[in-house]
Amino acid sequence: MPAFKSDFLRTMSERGFIHQISDETGLDQLFAKETVTAYVGYDATATSLHIGNLISATMLYWLQETGHRPIALMGGGTSMIGDPSFRDDQRSLLTPEAIATNIEGIKRIFGRILRFGDGPNDAIMVNNADWLMKLNYVEFLRDVGRHFSVNRMLTFDSVKLRLDREQSLSFLEFNYMILQGYDFVELARRQNCRLQMGGSDQWGNIINGVDLGHRMGTPQLYALTTPLLTTSSGAKMGKSAKGAVWLNGDLFSPYDFWQYWRNTEDADVERFLKIFTRLPLPEIARLAALGGSEINEAKKILATETTAIVHGREAANQAEETARKTFEEGALADTLPTVGADKAALEAGIGILSLLVTAGLASSNGEARRHIQGGAVRINDQSVSDDRRMVTLQDLSPENVVKLSLGKKKHVLVRPA
């Protein structure tokens, strides 16, 4: 990686964000001489972003922090189709109402990460439905479609994957990359946007936009992608025992979010501190140098700093305090995740297997049984060895809850409802 002159690209390089850049020298010179507008696109396929999206959102933060202007593009139009990149099947089509609801949910996270306003480098949020839904089909084919080579589009990895597996790729999905390329041109015209950023799986789509801009007479456009983020053991990030790691607290609690980062593998701590926190690099180097059990302190800092960015400092501190009380003092913290159980069902008795699934500590009865056989399950801090164990009202603590635990770090309170 070259020694960048601009603050933004130097920050991106030092913190490990860069996978590919379409023209390193040209983009570096552009950042060094003027305020640059750049964007990341987010399709509204759910009511929240997940931690995979946090990488690109953090890039937008550093873009603004180094004096440039970020755009968060909501895919209100492209979400009507769905991105086929590296998928085995076609996405379910969403209604306009569902997309609008999803966009409202996604907006919440950006309010914590970016500064919005009317200043020269204040962030803006735009929706590609504003131009895509107004297109005339025949004019679009004539003015835009003629610049795309089907032969070249068929060589993109995201398309080849589907075709090589002899899986259907609809004409609807095939058009997605054309629309994404056109988004770049529209933002160049409307907002003088010169750079699109995204994950490495979006490289082909972004380059389409760079090439389309050249053919349609925009100023030089640029592409920058991040590496696919995996753990040191090779696992793709973003999944937990409870499913996807969402950024909105109503889908994945701040406590669970904190715990996700606290459970980071030792080998990943330095890399994740660089990418997901705003700590100075010398402080990160100090934390990364900790050995033995001291590395756990670095993991706690990673968890607290990342949770503070996504959920706010108060929620992060509360999550850290809950963990401390639960693990270090053995106390029953009232901020642990909670699920309700029907009181009548508890009176009759609820099987431990189904209760573990309900609590999100297992994905199936089979997985719950394996946890019990492995000695990982406890009720009120007492080990469970019988997978036919029934949980009843007799198990309620003085606080009127049943504490379910999986291993040392995962706890859920069951309350009669």
UniProtKB/Swiss-Prot annotation:
Motif extent ('HIGH' region): 44-53
Gene (name only): tyrS
Keywords tagged on the record: Aminoacyl-tRNA synthetase, ATP-binding, Cytoplasm, Ligase, Nucleotide-binding, Protein biosynthesis, RNA-binding
Annotated NCBIfam families: tyrS
GO biological process terms on file: tyrosyl-tRNA aminoacylation
Presence of keyword Ligase: yes
GO cellular component labels: cytosol
Subunit note: Homodimer.
One of the record's GO molecular function terms: tyrosine-tRNA ligase activity
Entry similarity comment: Belongs to the class-I aminoacyl-tRNA synthetase family. TyrS type 1 subfamily.
Motif 'KMSKS' region in this chain: 236-240
UniProt protein name: Tyrosine--tRNA ligase
Sequence positions that bind L-tyrosine: Y39, Y176, Q180
All copies of domain S4 RNA-binding, residue ranges: 350-416
Primary role: Catalyzes the attachment of tyrosine to tRNA(Tyr) in a two-step reaction: tyrosine is first activated by ATP to form Tyr-AMP and then transferred to the acceptor end of tRNA(Tyr).
EC top class named in words: ligase
Binding site for ATP: K239
Reactions performed catalytically: tRNA(Tyr) + L-tyrosine + ATP = L-tyrosyl-tRNA(Tyr) + AMP + diphosphate + H(+)
Domain of life: Bacteria
Pfam family, one: SYY_C-terminal
InterPro entries, per the entry: aa-tRNA-synth_Ic, Rossmann-like_a/b/a_fold, S4_RNA-bd_sf, SYY-like_C, Tyr-tRNA-ligase, Tyr-tRNA-ligase_bac-type, Tyr-tRNA-ligase_bac_1
EC numbers on record: 6.1.1.1
Compartment(s): Cytoplasm
